[in-house]
């Protein structure tokens, strides 16, 4: 056994010495194809967009150095980070992370959001006292993509990680939902949440057409477009920040195969453990219980004279388990299309069967304009509308409306590379659980800090 370990170590050292597993800095990870939306990949891109010039020059220089002198010691990245002296002008978390990214062949972002929300009406129809205002949501999400190796013979191996941590103070969004009488929610996470959204190892084979991924993931990462699938950078309301009728897991262990025959086509098929609904832990043991969810996904991303676009279809099925005691089938059709350099239009039609969620159909249409006056890359204007069908088998109030509509608009103003503020207005027309009211409103100010 000792001889085997010695031989294996010698072989690995030889591979690294001769550059077979040499890691060029900032190599593109084909696990997330460039033209196809992936929620956590977009977060990494957004975090690094402001420093693109720095990255390009640093990546070019580092790549040249690495080709001439491959890393020969496991502690070389640590030595190089210390040599860069990222804290020479005082403590700078951003500069330290940039240095770590460069030396470890990774991308790192930490997104922190503070979201106060005011709502009207202030109390539900049967309540005697008003709810406390505002609700304060604190949202932290670290994201890491680490490319382990990249070579013509071995392909690309990478590890991806994302975690979602939600806390509330003063009041919760769930109480606000009840007060204004909606079947949806005023944001993507109405209560305290701990979710391991992503922890996968992916192997992309030479040629970059076939990728196999193992680990914990969620379909939320691909089910959407640029601005209707992430509360931290786009719309806030439940029906505009995700698939409102989704019955799939927030994070579950499984595997999927991705086929990208040409850059504009992305096809996926995979399975997950059916028992993990909220994704609070990484539980491999559930795979032995023989209950799995399955999905198929197709995405087409044409590059036309109008601009880049993406059109995708997702279909999935979930099993009956104690945490979600109903079997469901769901679908989601998405499109996003640039009309010129600044204007982006998007839409979604989604639905699901069963009694797992309050809304079983939803239609979305909206538009957004990023950096409209070329002031700051984080500047963004957005307006959208969603009409959702209420599931009467789940929302069992005596009097409910069949449909609920939300119109939302926001304006994000960037301040430097790390901070943005976003005033936001939601107007709910005909709240489903308040037939006595014609509308309800929610006012928000989102403060984002990106590292």
Swiss-Prot record:
Localization, UniProt: Cell outer membrane
Domain of life of the organism in this record?
A: Bacteria
Q: Which UniProt keywords apply?
A: Amino-acid transport, Cell outer membrane, Ion transport, Membrane, Porin, Signal, Transmembrane, Transmembrane beta strand, Transport, Virulence
| Signal peptide boundaries | 1-27
Pfam families from the entry?
Answer: OprB (PF04966)
User: Mind listing the GO biological process terms from this record?
Assistant: amino acid transport; carbohydrate transport; monoatomic ion transport
Q: How does it sit in the membrane?
A: Multi-pass membrane protein
Molecular function as annotated in GO? porin activity
Which Gene Ontology cellular-component terms appear in the entry? cell outer membrane; pore complex
Q: Tell me, what does this protein do in biology?
A: Facilitates L-arginine uptake, as part of the AaxABC system. The arginine uptake by the bacterium in the macrophage may be a virulence factor against the host innate immune response.
Q: Which family does it belong to?
A: Belongs to the OprB family.
Please state what the protein is called.
Answer: Porin AaxA
Recite the lineage of the species: Bacteria, Pseudomonadati, Chlamydiota, Chlamydiia, Chlamydiales
């Amino acid at each position: 056994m000792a001889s085997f370990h010695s031989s294996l170590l010698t072989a690995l050292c030889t591979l690294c010495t001769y550059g077979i597993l040499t890691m060029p800095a900032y190599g593109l990870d084909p696990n997330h194809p460039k033209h196809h939306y992936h929620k956590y990949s977009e977060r990494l891109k957004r975090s690094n967009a402001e420093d693109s010039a720095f990255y390009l020059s640093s990546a070019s220089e580092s790549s040249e150095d690495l080709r001439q002198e491959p890393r020969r010691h496991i502690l070389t990245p640590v030595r190089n980070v210390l040599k860069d002296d990222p804290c020479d002008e005082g403590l700078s978390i951003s500069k330290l992370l940039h240095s770590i990214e460069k030396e470890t062949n990774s991308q790192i972002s930490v997104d922190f959001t503070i979201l106060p929300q005011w709502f009207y009406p202030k109390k539900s129809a049967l309540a005697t006292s008003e709810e406390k205002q505002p609700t304060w949501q604190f949202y932290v999400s670290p994201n890491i993509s680490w490319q382990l190796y990249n070579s013509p013979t071995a392909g690309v191996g990478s590890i991806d990680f994302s975690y979602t941590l939600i806390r509330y103070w003063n009041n919760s969004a769930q109480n606000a939902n009840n007060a204004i009488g909606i079947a949806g929610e005023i944001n993507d996470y109405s209560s305290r949440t701990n979710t391991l959204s992503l922890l996968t190892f992916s192997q992309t084979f030479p040629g970059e057409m076939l990728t196999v991924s193992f680990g914990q993931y969620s379909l939320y990462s691909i089910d959407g477009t640029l601005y209707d699938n992430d509360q931290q950078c786009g719309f806030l309301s439940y029906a505009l920040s995700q698939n409102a009728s989704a019955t799939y897991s927030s994070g579950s262990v499984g595997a999927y195969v991705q086929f990208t025959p040409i850059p504009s086509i992305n096809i996926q098929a995979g399975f997950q453990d059916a028992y993990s609904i909220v994704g609070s832990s990484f539980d491999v043991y559930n795979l032995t219980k023989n209950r799995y969810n399955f999905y198929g996904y197709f995405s087409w991303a044409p590059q036309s004279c109008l601009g880049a676009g993406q059109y995708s279809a997702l279909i999935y099925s979930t099993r009956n388990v104690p945490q979600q005691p109903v079997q469901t089938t769901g679908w989601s059709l998405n499109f996003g299309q640039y009309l010129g350099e600044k204007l982006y239009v998007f839409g979604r039609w989604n639905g699901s069967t069963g009694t797992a969620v309050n809304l079983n159909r939803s239609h979305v249409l909206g538009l957004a304009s990023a950096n409209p006056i070329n002031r700051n890359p984080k500047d963004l204007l957005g307006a959208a509308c969603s009409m959702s069908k209420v599931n009467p088998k789940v929302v069992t109030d005596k009097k409910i409306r069949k449909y609920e509509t939300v119109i939302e608009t926001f304006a994000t103003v960037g301040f430097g590379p790390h901070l943005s503020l976003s005033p936001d207005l939601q107007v709910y027309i005909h709240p489903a659980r308040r037939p006595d009211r014609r509308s309800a409103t929610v006012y928000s100010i989102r403060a984002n800090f990106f590292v």
